[in-house]
Design a protein with these regions (language model features):
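Zn2+-dependent cytidine deaminase-like catalytic core
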Residues: 3-10, 39-161
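General secondary-structure propensity
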Residues: 1-2, 15, 32-33, 66-69
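Short glycine/serine- and small hydrophobic-enriched flexible loop segments
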Residues: 15, 33-36, 85-88
């Protein structure tokens, strides 16, 4: 049976996450416009810096920082950010981003995954209009990015995931 397009792109994002170097959670992101892949990104330290997986230590894990908090302590650049950084803005306007996250230890899909507040702002400014996030192998959530603009979480004080 032929895979539908959304799961096809989510499968590719899931393959991209296998390059991730985080000891906690790995994400893969791809940006697609007009059925062409514009860019990919995965979690990893900035170019030239040592990755957590190579160092064998995660500062946020050592400090027991909960998910969605204190990202300034993290060495990594998020998958969404790397996908945006590696693309030209004019190619991203009107595009969709596909995102898959897995626990680095168990390989289980990240429950209730969503872009963090910084990634949301970058996605908005990149001109991406849809975010599709895999919940499990067959189910996904589709987010209209315009909803993030009209429901500004920074005004309500709700941040993080």
């Amino acid at each position: 049976m032929r895979t539908d397009k959304i799961n096809y792109y989510l499968d590719i994002a899931e393959t991209v996450l296998e390059r991730g170097t985080c000891l906690r959670r790995n994400y893969g992101a791809i940006i697609v416009k007009n059925d062409a892949i514009i860019s990919t990104g995965y979690v990893g330290a900035p170019r030239g810096r040592q990755n957590c997986i190579d160092m064998g230590v995660c500062v946020r894990e050592t400090l027991k920082v909960p998910r969605g908090e204190r990202y300034e302590l993290c060495r990594s650049v998020h998958a969404e950010q790397n996908a945006i950084i590696n693309a030209a803005r004019e190619d991203m306007i009107g595009a969709a981003m596909f995102l898959v996250g897995k626990d680095a230890k168990t390989g289980a899909y990240v429950e209730n995954a969503c872009a963090c507040s910084l990634c949301k702002r970058m996605i908005i400014n990149a001109g991406i209009i849809r975010l599709i996030i895999r919940n499990n192998k067959t189910h996904y959530t589709e987010i209209n990015v315009a909803d993030w603009v009209s429901n500004d979480e920074s005004v309500s004080g709700v941040m993080g995931y």
